[in-house]
Amino acid sequence: MATGPRYKVPMRRRREVRTDYHQRLRLLKSGKPRLVARVSNKHVRAQLVTPGPQGDETHAAATSADLDEYGWEAPTGNLPSAYLTGYLAGIRALAAGVEEAVLDIGLNTATPGNKVFAVQEGAIDAGLEIPHNDAVLADWDRNRGVHIAEYAEQLDEPLYSGDFDATNLPEHFDEVLGNLQEDE
């Protein structure tokens, strides 16, 4: 371990690989609420957050587990569920009076077409004003899950035996999106 007067121990949340303080400061200087998008292998979370003296204040939040209320039966860690989670977070943010935000992807890599940008696209389609570059957003077929359905069709039947038939994912996506739009 490095020692000496020039050695500086990183802040705890940076050591735990949880917070990029340089990025956080840039986002806070914008003065807009942050759309915090966090993804895991099983779920997607989206929150609209503003900084406060006692800590960050959450104005609206949605997780992919909330999609069950709207009829979502597919797994909750994929790209279509990320889009729908962003859409749901956008609806809830507009209901809470938040109309604009900036995307906070945390320590995720900014790969075009990934799940954090699907969350952003869902929130934009719900009506939030979020500055973005269209080059990072996935095409509509990918948001609907056409790529997952095509892959599921190629699999042998014994290898593919789940509770949900992924070959019907695009139609299921359209159905759940319609349910979300009805509840706006």
UniProtKB/Swiss-Prot annotation:
Q: What Pfam families does the entry give?
A: Ribosomal_L5e
Alphabetically, which GO biological process terms does the record hold? ribosomal large subunit assembly; translation
Which keywords does this chain's UniProt record carry?
Answer: Ribonucleoprotein, Ribosomal protein, RNA-binding, rRNA-binding
What GO molecular functions are on record for this protein?
5S rRNA binding; structural constituent of ribosome
Output the Gene Ontology cellular-component terms: cytosolic large ribosomal subunit
Does this UniProt record's set of keywords contain Coiled coil? Answer: no
- Tree of life domain: Archaea
Share what the entry says about its subunit structure, partners included: Part of the 50S ribosomal subunit. Contacts the 5S and 23S rRNAs.
Q: What is the annotated role of this protein in its UniProt record?
A: This is one of the proteins that bind and probably mediate the attachment of the 5S RNA into the large ribosomal subunit, where it forms part of the central protuberance.
Family of this protein: Belongs to the universal ribosomal protein uL18 family.
User: Protein name, please?
Assistant: Large ribosomal subunit protein uL18
What is the organism field in this record? Answer: Haloferax mediterranei (strain ATCC 33500 / DSM 1411 / JCM 8866 / NBRC 14739 / NCIMB 2177 / R-4) (Halobacterium mediterranei)
